[in-house]
Every structure is written in C-alpha cells, then in structure tokens.
Amino acid sequence: FQKTAQQYDLDWHFLAAIGYQESYLKPDSVSPTGVRGIMMLTNNTAKAMGVSNRTDPAQSIQGGAKYFDQMLSRYSHIRNPDRNWFALVAYNMGPGAVDGIQKRLRAQGKNPNDWMTMYNFLQHNQASNGRYKQAVQYVTRIRSYLEHIKTSPKLLEI
C-alpha cells in the first residue's frame, strides 16, 4: 500500500482502509456482483485501470489506487476532507451515481459539494435505495479504519 500510494501521491492509510473494507485484505475475494480482489474492482474498472488479474494483490492495489486517485481528481473542486468522502462514495457507487445525487441536491437549492449535505441525503433516502445505505456504511467504516490504522503501530508495515 505504501509503495503504490507514493506513485499517486495518496495517503497509504486510505488505500489500506479501502482494501480492508472491500475484502478484509483477502486477494481472492469475490462478491456476488462479480467484483473481486483486495480492492474489489469490477471487470470494466480493472480493464480501464490496466489490471489484467484482479486477484493479484499488486495489480489490485495498483488498480484501486489509480481509480481512487481518479475519483479524487474528479472532485478536486471540493475541499478536503469532504473531497475524500465524495471520492469514497464514488469508488463505492460509481461517479455517475454521485453526479446524479449532486444534481438532485442542486435542484433542491442545497450545496452539492458539502459532505454533510451529501451524507444527510444518503441517510434520509436509504430506505428507497439500498446503495445509499451501503455508501453511508462504507464511508463510516473506512473513516473508523483510518483512525485505527493511524493509531496502531503494528499496522505500519502493511
């Protein structure tokens, strides 16, 4: 994680937390939806990121880092730390879903680039869309893992 994070100028803790949330760091993980590997890449995302073997740990981490970096760039107009949370939702749901939610928020006269506004939308609409509930849990868990990773000296060798 550390080596790959350096290539993209990313915080390696984020990559490790994403990998843990996605697969518990198990390279052979496969979801019923077809995503696989440590970073649980879809086949299309893997191809777009240059990954030929999603269950190869190095390729999966490389592909996940590249994709997360693209999501961060996509939301570069949003200030940190909010940009991180938007990028995580996009990593989880896809950027098209985030764009659609932002469009709805804008139409409601709300700030579509504010994390709490996005979070509240996802939270209040999760009964109508299971992906919203999943996105809330995804970001919440990764934020928790980030704190744990940053405060656990034993994890510094990931």
Where are these regions (language model features)?
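Catalytic glycan-binding domains that act on GlcNAc-containing polysaccharides
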Residues: 1-158
